């Protein structure tokens, strides 16, 4: 099964947490990309500060690695308040959430990552806390049990999720601000790589940064990870300068091609071409052919390949596109020309 150790995995890897923290932007002015989100948050934060209020509860959603945690920290910094961070799976009992809520000061930010994974019992405690700044606590057991209400200071809940569709309607409706993060353009990722290289003390040419950006799958976390690996290559095989040629050599050595595909992506596409004549093929047959789990194909591999137009989902199964054949220098089959997509290229319902 594929894990997050793939070089182009969007999920964080334990070894890079301290590095990511060092290069993470602290203010909205430093945040690159997502212009719509930045503009709206700038207005909402400025208005809240002008009134002396806490910011409305904010939900940030989108694919992993796009900067949801970074935005939560920026919101706290711009509001000049403290931030307490946790995640949905960690809050197993209502008491866990109650302990965090009662330790908040007025205006503080409570950041809950993977908020879609909150247990139902914990989520119910969150409703009155978000809406009325009150905490309902049960004291005693059996017939003697009674409920008391504790007043909470006005705080801002920032929730982050990669699966907004899994949020319950009552929870989603309690967020006054909802922001979706989109994949980054190559130009934006180039700026991010240039900035990160400067902070890491890497002598990077703009062409070298652009070469990394083109292969980063629209994701800053991947771009920064590739930057660190190319830096290593430049120090050992070059003179330490990050040029386009050095970046190309390093990423080719790491099997990340010009479209950001790695060996697992290419293995999946080639299995469809060589073993199933380009499709259509069912996902279970495909999983057996490459010895991977169905969920891995649907949740990890397919979304990017569909988004980039290398694969289609049709009513009869998965089909590789003309672009996939051309990527490998092969001639498309007749099935490619007649396939009707169930999911349009560039979208994924995984």
Curated annotation (Swiss-Prot):
Residue ranges of the region described as Head domain (RuvB-H): 258-350
Keyword Amino-acid biosynthesis belongs to the record: no
UniProt keyword list: ATP-binding, Cytoplasm, DNA damage, DNA recombination, DNA repair, DNA-binding, Hydrolase, Nucleotide-binding
GO CC terms of this entry: cytoplasm; Holliday junction resolvase complex
Domain of life: Bacteria
Single GO term (MF): ATP hydrolysis activity
Localization, UniProt: Cytoplasm
Catalysed reactions, semicolon-separated: ATP + H2O = ADP + phosphate + H(+)
Main location: cytoplasm
Region span, Small ATPAse domain (RuvB-S): 185-255
SMART domains: AAA
NCBIfam families cross-referenced by the UniProt entry: PRK00080.1, ruvB
HAMAP family noted in UniProt: DNA_HJ_migration_RuvB (MF_00016)
Entry similarity comment: Belongs to the RuvB family.
Comment, domains: Has 3 domains, the large (RuvB-L) and small ATPase (RuvB-S) domains and the C-terminal head (RuvB-H) domain. The head domain binds DNA, while the ATPase domains jointly bind ATP, ADP or are empty depending on the state of the subunit in the translocation cycle. During a single DNA translocation step the structure of each domain remains the same, but their relative positions change.
Protein known as: Holliday junction branch migration complex subunit RuvB
Name of the coding gene: ruvB
């Amino acid at each position: 099964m594929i894990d997050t150790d793939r070089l182009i995995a969007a999920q964080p890897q334990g070894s890079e947490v301290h590095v990511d923290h060092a290069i993470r932007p602290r203010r909205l002015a430093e945040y690159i990309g997502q212009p719509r989100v930045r503009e709206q948050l700038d207005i909402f934060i400025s208005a809240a500060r002008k009134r002396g209020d806490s910011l409305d509860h904010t939900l940030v959603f989108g694919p992993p690695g796009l900067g949801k945690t970074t935005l939560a920290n920026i919101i706290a910094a711009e509001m000049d308040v403290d931030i307490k961070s946790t995640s949905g799976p960690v809050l197993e009992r209502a008491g866990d959430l109650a302990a965090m809520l009662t330790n908040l000061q007025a205006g503080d930010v409570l950041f809950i990552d993977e908020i879609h994974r909150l247990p139902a019992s914990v989520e119910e405690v969150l409703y009155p806390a978000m809406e009325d700044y009150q905490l309902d606590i049960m004291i005693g057991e059996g017939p003697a049990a009674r409920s008391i209400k504790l007043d909470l200071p006005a705080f801002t809940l920032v929730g982050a999720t990669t699966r907004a569709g899994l949020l319950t309607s009552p929870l989603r409706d309690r967020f006054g601000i909802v922001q979706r993060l989109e994949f980054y353009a190559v130009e934006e990722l180039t700026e991010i790589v240039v900035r990160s290289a400067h902070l890491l003390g890497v002598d990077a040419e703009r062409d070298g940064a652009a070469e990394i950006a083109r292969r980063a799958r629209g994701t800053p976390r991947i771009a920064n990870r590739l930057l660190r690996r190319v830096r290593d290559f430049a120090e050992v095989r070059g003179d330490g300068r990050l040029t386009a040629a050095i970046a190309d050599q390093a990423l080719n050595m790491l099997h990340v091609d010009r479209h950001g595909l790695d060996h697992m992506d290419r293995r999946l596409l080639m299995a469809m071409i060589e073993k199933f004549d380009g499709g259509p093929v069912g996902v279970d047959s495909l999983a057996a052919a490459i010895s991977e789990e169905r969920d891995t194909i649907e949740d990890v591999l397919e979304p990017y390949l569909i988004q980039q137009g290398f694969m289609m989902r049709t009513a009869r199964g998965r089909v590789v596109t003309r672009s996939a054949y051309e990527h490998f220098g092969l001639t498309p089959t007749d099935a490619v020309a007649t396939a009707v997509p169930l999911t349009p290229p560039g979208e994924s319902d995984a």
